[in-house]
From Swiss-Prot:
Pfam families: Abhydrolase_1. It comes from Kluyveromyces lactis (strain ATCC 8585 / CBS 2359 / DSM 70799 / NBRC 1267 / NRRL Y-1140 / WM37) (Yeast). GO terms for molecular function: acetyl-CoA hydrolase activity; carboxylic ester hydrolase activity; transferase activity. The gene is EAT1. Keywords: Hydrolase, Mitochondrion, Transferase, Transit peptide. Residues 1-21 form a transit peptide. This is Ethanol acetyltransferase 1. Residues 67-171 form the AB hydrolase-1 domain. The lineage of its organism: Eukaryota, Fungi, Dikarya, Ascomycota, Saccharomycotina. Its EC number is 2.3.1.268, 3.1.2.1, 3.1.1.-. Disulfide bonds: none annotated. The keyword Transferase applies.
Length: 368
């Protein structure tokens, strides 16, 4: 399953992507109107693989039956969390895959951009790399992808760590998401910052400041800026990186709609009778609106064997409290998950009833 003992192995599918999209959008296309994104039901997500720096089994080849997949949030990327995932790989003695979801980082730009499609990309990734059963860590958008994947494909997941999100529609976060993406579009339309400007980052930050006063949030967004077109790993078909201006790695103009409506949504009817019986750890940022007291009913309904760990932070908890969230993740996979499994196994009647209910539901679904 794992071919190397190197601590960090970058294996993005860049050559294939470049061949598929070797002709970026021209200036004329950009100026004449919004070039449509291609439609793809499944993409090969770009990824990095982080292996433990020290193995408890000495010089023997390291092997783990349960690798971890780390799914980032909206406007995030695998690069943002490479140091965190290296620490997790070593602390947990297991391989950690960090991926770029579609329209982010080094992965392809394509529609649809909704949770069902992102789950399909994740399932494809697991099968493509022959990972078997995995654990998932999901943050924000990635948290909802992880929850939905566990509910729809429980056979592929052992445990999940869900960071500051809940399995429910969240219309109250649409304003936040809209501001986040619109600030990027405003920077492109009004900032017109050149790539050869030595003060490009300062000027971009000042442009965003009107909409994003928090410096930490601005830095999170600025991590997506392309200021050197010669090192762009993925040449988007809808972005002209050769016009002398800075650009985002994301097709932000195309995400104005789906990046708000679909990201705040949740397929309630599709999963209303489903449960995931594996252990799930919810990390709740206490200064965030993504998990509120009303969310607990949905969490307990879908994930009966859960633990909720609170951290005093905003929704950007990974940036604000990196050591605290890492400790919470490590403690969950080392200790709490087994406590939740024991709790589940001590109530075999309830466990078997739930299993039979899920099995019958799946059988009915297949017959329709």
């Amino acid at each position: 399953m794992f071919l190397s003992l190197r601590p960090s192995l970058s294996v993005s599918r860049l050559a294939v992507v470049r061949r598929a999209y070797s002709s970026p959008a021209s200036k004329k296309q950009i100026n004449d109107g919004l070039v449509p994104l291609p439609h793809k039901e499944v993409i090969d997500m770009a990824f990095d693989l982080h292996l433990p720096e020290r193995s408890v089994i000495g010089k023997l080849p390291y092997h783990s039956p349960e690798p971890i997949i780390f799914f980032h949030g909206l406007l995030g990327s695998k690069r943002n969390y490479k140091h965190d995932c290296k620490k997790l790989a070593t602390a947990l003695q297991t391989p950690v895959y960090t991926v770029d979801v579609r329209n982010h980082g080094s992965s392809e730009h394509a529609l649809p951009f909704n949770y069902g499609t992102l789950v399909n990309d994740l399932v494809h990734f697991i099968h493509q790399h022959k990972l078997g059963k995995v654990n998932i860590i999901g943050y924000s958008l990635g948290a909802k992808v992880g929850m939905l994947a566990c509910l729809k494909h429980p056979e592929l997941f052992s445990a999940a760590c869900i960071i500051d999100n809940a399995p429910e529609p969240q219309p109250h976060i649409k304003a936040f998401l809209s501001t986040l993406i619109k600030s990027c579009v405003k920077l492109l339309d009004q900032g017109k910052v050149r790539v050869d400007d030595k003060l490009w980052r300062h000027k971009a930050s000042e442009s965003l400041k009107r909409y994003l006063p928090n410096a930490g949030v601005r830095n999170y967004v600025l991590n997506n800026i392309v200021h050197n077109p010669r090192v762009v790993e993925y040449r988007s078909p809808v972005i002209n990186y050769d016009d002398g201006l800075i650009h985002f790695k994301n097709p932000v103009r195309h995400m104005l709609d789906c990046g708000v409506k679909d990201v705040a949504d949740w397929p309630t009817e599709e999963v209303k009778d489903k449960k995931f019986l594996g252990p799930v750890n919810f990390i709740r940022a206490t200064k965030s609106a993504f998990i509120n007291p009303d969310s607990l009913k949905a969490i307990n309904s879908f994930f009966p064997f859960n633990n909720i760990h609170e951290i005093n932070a905003t929704h950007f908890v990974l940036n604000e409290r990196p050591q605290e969230y890492l400790r919470a993740v490590i403690d969950f996979f080392k200790v709490t998950r087994y406590q939740l499994e024991n709790k589940r196994n001590k109530d075999p009647n309830n466990y078997m009833q739930t299993q039979n209910s899920i099995s019958n539901s799946d059988t009915m679904g297949q017959s329709l």
